A protein has these predicted regions:
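Sec-dependent bacterial lipoprotein signal peptides
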Residues: 1-23
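Bacterial Sec-dependent N-terminal signal peptides
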Residues: 16-41
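Short beta-strand segments of immunoglobulin-like
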Residues: 47-52
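Structural beta-strand segments of beta-rich domains
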Residues: 54-60
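Short tyrosine-centred short linear motifs in exposed loops/low-complexity segments
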Residues: 55, 116-121
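Aromatic/hydrophobic beta-strand junction motif of beta-rich domains
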Residues: 60-67
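An anionic, turn-rich surface loop/hairpin at beta-sheet edges
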Residues: 88-114
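Short acidic/polar inter-strand loop motif in beta-rich domains
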Residues: 127-141
């Protein structure tokens, strides 16, 4: 075998080993969890217009909390019933032995449309962490009222 082929084979072996060891690249060893929407004294923000038109879609942007092993916003499920839109954001957390000690904001953007007029509610449902929950998360919700004309 020539030196070039040996080097190529060696580099290929190193690359495969590195990829197999890196869960962040392959997505193996991670879990999708309800997003953290209350972090101690801070709550997620829901950015949406104050007033919208009936039957027209509008954009809603939700700030969630991440950091450490949670570094990616994955999806947000939306369910609309009458004057209530429930939004459930989810983030990806890597399974790791060590994670960074930082706080990140992870943003979720969804489209919402109400077919009824009047006062409506955007309800974001997720998890909270704080003094009352200790080191574990508990259920949480944050709401914002808007007017549909």
């Amino acid at each position: 075998m020539s030196i070039g082929r040996r080097l190529t084979a060696s580099f290929a072996g190193i690359a495969l080993t590195a990829l197999a060891a890196c869960d962040g690249v392959t997505g193996v060893g991670s879990r999708v969890e309800p997003a953290l929407i209350i972090f101690y004294r801070d709550s997620s923000t829901i950015v949406a217009p104050d007033t919208v038109s009936r039957g027209e879609a509008f954009t809603v942007r939700i700030k969630t909390f991440g950091g450490g092993c949670t570094r990616e916003a994955v999806r947000a499920d939306v369910a609309i019933a009458g004057t209530l839109a429930e939004i459930r954001p989810f983030n990806r957390t890597q399974n790791a032995n060590a994670c960074t000690a930082d706080l990140l904001f992870l943003y979720h953007t969804v489209q919402v449309r109400f077919d009824v007029g009047g006062r409506t509610v955007l309800r974001v449902m997720g998890e909270q962490r704080g003094a009352s929950t200790g080191g574990t998360n508990g259920p949480a919700l944050v709401e914002r009222a808007i007017v549909v004309r």
